[in-house]
A protein has these predicted regions:
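Core catalytic DNA strand-manipulation module of type IA topoisomerases
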Residues: 1-211
Length: 211
């Protein structure tokens, strides 16, 4: 397997952009560009498909370490140390877990925690927020310890007083909890194909239906 260079033509249509098929020959691409410049364009097909993306799962230790590294550059040990310190301060649940779900007996508690987290900056701009707890519950997917979430203690905690690393990690866990309790992201994927001088161009877009 080896990479092969190719060229694409881009067609601007009322603010949208359609992309041509691949040209491996530069001369052929230039010829097609010359032919299409100022030429008539015909829409040959439009397809629409409704798609749904489920909310993300909660953090276990591994996924928390990965995301903290990607966003903040923290090492796995740094993330564990910050999470352990937050656990000892009773702001996060036990961090050494391999589960990304909660148990059914936590449903009422986590609902309260979600509403508390939604009041914290920078999440306090959320309005009309109705969390869905059911998607986070799975008794069979929890062995020794459930997923990492904030605790009820956040109601009286001074988050701004936390050291930067701990504060970043704490807000990251809060953000994941809020995202995990959101409704599915539903959108309509639209694909349109166009013909210009015998060359095919494709434009793709989406229309948000629910988020």
């Amino acid at each position: 397997f080896h990479k092969e260079k190719y060229h694409l033509l881009r067609l601007t249509l009322n603010g949208a952009e359609a992309v041509s098929e691949k040209f491996t020959d530069p001369a052929e691409a230039e010829q097609a560009a010359a032919m299409c410049k100022g030429a008539a364009v015909t829409c040959t097909s439009v397809t629409k498909e409704q798609k749904k993306e489920q909310p993300p799962k909660l953090y276990d230790l591994t996924t928390l370490q990965r995301e903290a590294n990607r966003l903040f550059g923290y090492t796995a040990k740094q993330t564990l140390d910050y999470a352990q310190s937050l656990y000892e301060k009773k702001l996060l649940t036990y961090p050494r877990t391999d589960s990304r779900y909660l148990t059914s007996d936590m449903a009422e508690t986590v609902s309260c925690v979600i509403h508390l987290a939604a009041k914290l900056p920078p999440f306090d701009g959320c309005s009309n927020f109705f969390p869905l707890v059911e998607t986070m519950i799975s008794d069979k997917d929890v062995s020794d310890h459930h997923a990492i979430i904030p605790t009820m203690e956040i109601e009286k905690a001074d988050i701004k007083a936390l050291p930067l690393g701990e504060r970043n990690l704490f807000l990251l866990v809060c953000c994941k909890l809020l995202c995990a309790s959101a409704e599915p992201y539903v959108y309509e994927a639209v694909t349109a194909t166009f013909d210009c001088c015998g060359h095919s161009f494709t434009a793709k877009g989406k229309r948000i239906l629910s988020e």
